[in-house]
Structure formats: structure tokens, C-alpha cells
């Protein structure tokens, strides 16, 4: 949705990325992607850290200079956990150590899940990316960017000439749709799809508080995560930076839009 000349991600920030050339080539038939690279920042009690965890992060936390020094600090702190991790907290510490866990994982995760990390299962975190380089690119994907003009325009181009039915509940018309399509992609609640045969799942939702600000720059980055427990929101998105603060004519945008996520 365009507001004040800014393509505002109404349903949350999304950065397209893929390693599959076939997918990239297909979408480029319907849009042109800009060169946006996702490089989020973490704010822990007023201190800023680079994400994903990389040499900038380790230098800020420990003052280390070399990858060898960084890995030595991580290995030293990982030893705190003996045996199989029993919960998410122990799993995270066993992967990256307590300092990174306390500053950059604990508060953010507990706000996302609404649970203490000690009460969350360890399998939620299979691995945590640790980069012993000064690479701030969040994704490892070969192809990455934001569709110029927005995702809505891209989807409209894809759907041109295709029948679209809105406001239809697949589960109420399952037999009908199963007959007219070889493949169906279902994006509704998975427990409803199986008719709650294993019970009802718990769901977490995301709430956005959006503000239009009469300033040119609020935080200087598209995404800033707030990783302490005291700050109620998980992150702030400043939408204009997905397109480098420019309008479609390449002119600087005078205002900005931020979204606080809860």
C-alpha cells in the first residue's frame, strides 16, 4: 500500500530471496527487483549490534579482532551446558554462549513466543548462524531484493488473465476445488485442515502500530530488532529504506513511516 509516496508493507516486512535461478527468472518476467540487501540491527538497551552474528557483533561484545579470538570466546562459553540441552535457553547457550544469548536472543525470543526461554523446547532453535566474517547480509541467498513498485504490483502482473475468487473458504468447498485443480496450495490453519484430529494448536499473532512521521529519517535502517525484555515491541520497520528512501522518480522522500511490531 502506498502512503506518502512510500511503499508500506501493510502485512509485515518481506524481503524476497532465493537460491533458485528458475524462480528468480520467473519472477523477473513480472517485475524488476531492486538491490536491497537485508542487514538488520539489534538494539539491546541502547547498544547497537550487527545481525546476523558476525565479526562486527563479536567485536562489539568482546572486543575481539580475529575470527580465532571470536571462536575461542564462543567455545569457552558453550562449555556451560553439559549434556543434552533441555530447553531453548540451554540450546542457545550451547550454540553461541551466554553473552550473545542474554543480549541478542533471550528477550527477543520471549517477546515473540510469550513464554520464558526455559519453558520453550530446544528444537525451536536447530542452529544459529555464526559468521566469522564482517558480512552483514542476513540471507545467504544468491538472489535478493524488493520488487520495484511493490509486491502488490508484482502479484497483479502474475495474476493477469487468471481467474481469482476472493472470500472463499477452501475447507467449506474442498470437494469442489479438489476437482478443478491438480495441485492446491493451502495457506490456512493446519489444524483446521486436518479437522482438528489432533486437537487445536496454539497460535501467536503479530500486531502492528504504524506512524507517519514528518521527518526524513527515523532509524537509518529498514529493520531494528529490540532484544531486551523491557521494550514492549520486538522490532521497528522503517519502510522507506527498502527502497533507499527514494520515490519512483529517484527523489528523496520527505516523510517516513515506521511500524512497531508486537
Predicted features, each with a name:
Residues 1-30, 40:
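Glycine-rich FAD cofactor-binding loop and adjacent beta-loop-alpha segment at the N-terminus
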Residues 42-50, 55-183, 187-194:
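Active-site/ligand-binding neighborhood in enzyme catalytic cores
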Residues 10-14, 144-145, 210-211:
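A short acidic, glycine-rich active-site loop
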Residues 7, 32, 163-165:
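Conserved beta-strand segments of alpha/beta enzyme cores
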Residues 170-262:
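Mid-domain catalytic core of redox enzymes
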Residues 2, 40-44, 224-226:
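Short acidic-hydrophobic surface loop/beta-edge motif
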Residues 36-38, 167-169, 239:
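Conserved beta-strand termini and adjacent loop/short-helix elements that scaffold enzyme active sites
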Residues 17, 43, 259-261:
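Short, well-ordered beta-strand micro-motif
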Amino acid at each position: 500500500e502506498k502512503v506518502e509516496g512510500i511503499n508500506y508493507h501493510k502485512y509485515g516486512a518481506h524481503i524476497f530471496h532465493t537460491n533458485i535461478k528458475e524462480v528468480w527468472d520467473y519472477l523477473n518476467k513480472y517485475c524488476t527487483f531492486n538491490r536491497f540487501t537485508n542487514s538488520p540491527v539489534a538494539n539491546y538497551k541502547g547498544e547497537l549490534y550487527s545481525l546476523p552474528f558476525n565479526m562486527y557483533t563479536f567485536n562489539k561484545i568482546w572486543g575481539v579482532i580475529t575470527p580465532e579470538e571470536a571462536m575461542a570466546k564462543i567455545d569457552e562459553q558453550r562449555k556451560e551446558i553439559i549434556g543434552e540441552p533441555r530447553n531453548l535457553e540451554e540450546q542457545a547457550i550451547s550454540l553461541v554462549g551466554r553473552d550473545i544469548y542474554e543480549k541478542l536472543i533471550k528477550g527477543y525470543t520471549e517477546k515473540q513466543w510469550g513464554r520464558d526461554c526455559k519453558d520453550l523446547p530446544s528444537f525451536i532453535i536447530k542452529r544459529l548462524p555464526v559468521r566469522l566474517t564482517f558480512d552483514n547480509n542476513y540471507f545467504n541467498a544468491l538472489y535478493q531484493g524488493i520488487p520495484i513498485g511493490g509486491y502488490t504490483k508484482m502479484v497483479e502482473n502474475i495474476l493477469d488473465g487468471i481467474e481469482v475468487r476472493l472470500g472463499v473458504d477452501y475447507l467449506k468447498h474442498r470437494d469442489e476445488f479438489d476437482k478443478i485443480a491438480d495441485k492446491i496450495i493451502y495457506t490456512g490453519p493446519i489444524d483446521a485442515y486436518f479437522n482438528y484430529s489432533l486437537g487445536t494448536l496454539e497460535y501467536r499473532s503479530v500486531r502492528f502500530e504504524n506512524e507517519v512521521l514528518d521527518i526524513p529519517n527515523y532509524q537509518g535502517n529498514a529493520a531494528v530488532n529490540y532484544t531486551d525484555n523491557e521494550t514492549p515491541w520486538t522490532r521497528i520497520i522503517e519502510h522507506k529504506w527498502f527502497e533507499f528512501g527514494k520515490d519512483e522518480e529517484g527523489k528523496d522522500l520527505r516523510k517516513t513511516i515506521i511500524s512497531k511490531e508486537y
